[in-house]
Amino acid sequence: MPGKPVLHYFDGRGRMEPIRWLLAAAGVEFEEQFLKTRDDLARLRNDGSLMFQQVPMVEIDGMKLVQTRAILNYIATKYNLYGKDMKERALIDMYAEGVADLDEIVLHYPYIPPGEKEASLAKIKDKARNRYFPAFEKVLKSHGQDYLVGNRLSRADVYLVQVLYHVEELDPSALANFPLLKALRTRVSNLPTVKKFLQPGSQRKPLEDEKCVESAVKIFS
């Protein structure tokens, strides 16, 4: 019987957090091997585990997968979170890429120099409230279904809800004008697997604090 997936990254959100969320939503238990020093990263590079010399890396089904989107696609396919046909997968990909564009801004926020944080937060608020949230609200309104694609949970829903939580940590009233997104967040959060993941003590990572940022900089700089 195959073992649990093993996630190789530092002990923070970064580019691994969508992978943690998706595995959790699928009800898949996983282990984590945290990078703590530059030497830990060097060891993975030197033993050939990192095809492009970078993490995240996930050991799963006898493979050492890198590149976040490739990992997410594999997990989504394996656990039936990737639509029923090509058209649904195309929509899921399109929506997930939109979420990724917003996530790219959000995940860098803790690493922004103090003097630039105000401008960075303003950008996050603007992009979330005026570009991305309205687009996803419109999708949900257009078909009146519970989820973004095919009226069933997909990796796009999980990723969107993950980023909704992240944005709300920085901008608590971000969803005030988006009732369907709020309903989606609640719906996904109440799924037993996700509800468990949202409880204290789970493998979900908190918003990076100064100590976490310093640790990441030491490993990757």
Curated annotation (Swiss-Prot):
The gene is Gsta3. One of its GO terms (molecular function) is glutathione transferase activity. One of its GO terms (biological process) is glutathione metabolic process. Gene3D superfamilies: 1.20.1050.10, Glutaredoxin (3.40.30.10). Belongs to the GST superfamily. Alpha family. InterPro entries: Glutathione-S-Trfase_C-like (IPR010987), Glutathione-S-Trfase_C_sf (IPR036282), Glutathione_S-Trfase (IPR040079), Glutathione_S-Trfase_N (IPR004045), GST_alpha (IPR003080), GST_C (IPR004046), GST_superfamily (IPR050213), Thioredoxin-like_sf (IPR036249). GO terms for cellular component: cytosol. It is found in: Cytoplasm. Heterodimer of YC1 and YC2. PROSITE patterns: GST_CTER (PS50405), GST_NTER (PS50404). This is Glutathione S-transferase alpha-3. Its EC number is 2.5.1.18. It comes from Rattus norvegicus. Disulfide bonds: none annotated. Conjugation of reduced glutathione to a wide number of exogenous and endogenous hydrophobic electrophiles. Catalyzes isomerization reactions that contribute to the biosynthesis of steroid hormones. Efficiently catalyze obligatory double-bond isomerizations of delta(5)-androstene-3,17-dione and delta(5)-pregnene-3,20-dione, precursors to testosterone and progesterone, respectively. Has substantial activity toward aflatoxin B1-8,9-epoxide.
